[in-house]
């Protein structure tokens, strides 16, 4: 059975919420910036998985369900990407997974690395985030 992931592309004030993954060799893309989310458990829908993962990782639940945006199976695992508004200020989020979080600008998202205040250094963007950014930029060009 293929394990898929559900990811959240959350926007607040023209910036997008990112997670800096832990520096643990056993996880995919350690030390890279990516989106909050995670594995879809057996019998769980991707929509339920993204809600659960947000609660587990940042102790936050959206007031309205996130909207399915797109699915992609070109990476290491099939990904279901959801989008929505981050209605809580960054300071109200409680980071429980990962080593940093950040609201990144479009310019930062289009670069190869993003600064981590916690680590005090530039960290790379996960390849999966590049797929999401290409989709976002294509939609912005179409608008």
Per-segment meaning from a language model:
Residues 55-90:
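Active-site segment of metal-dependent pyrophosphate-handling enzymes
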Residues 1-18, 36:
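Conserved N-terminal beta-strand and adjoining loop/helix that marks the start
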Residues 11-16, 23-25, 41, 75-76, ...:
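Short, charged/polar surface micro-motifs in flexible loops or helix N-caps
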Residues 4, 78-82, 102:
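Short beta-strand micro-motifs in enzyme catalytic cores
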Residues 26, 30, 75, 94-143:
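Nudix hydrolase/Nudix homology domain
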Residues 15-56:
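Conserved Nudix-box catalytic region and its N-terminal flanking loop in Nudix hydrolases
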């Amino acid at each position: 059975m293929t394990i898929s992931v559900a990811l959240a592309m959350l926007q607040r004030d023209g910036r997008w919420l990112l997670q800096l993954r832990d520096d643990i060799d056993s996880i995919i893309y350690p030390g890279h910036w990516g989106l909050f989310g995670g594995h879809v458990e057996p019998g769980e829908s991707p929509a339920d998985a993204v809600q659960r993962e947000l609660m587990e990782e940042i102790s936050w639940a959206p007031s309205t369900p996130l909207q399915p945006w797109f699915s992609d199976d070109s990476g290491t695992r099939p990904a279901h990407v959801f989008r929505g508004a981050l209605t809580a200020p960054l300071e109200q989020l409680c980071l429980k997974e990962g080593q940093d979080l950040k609201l990144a600008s479009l310019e930062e998202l289009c670069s190869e690395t993003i600064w981590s205040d916690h680590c005090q250094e530039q960290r790379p963007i996960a390849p999966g985030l590049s797929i999401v950014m290409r989709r976002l930029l294509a939609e912005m060009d179409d608008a």
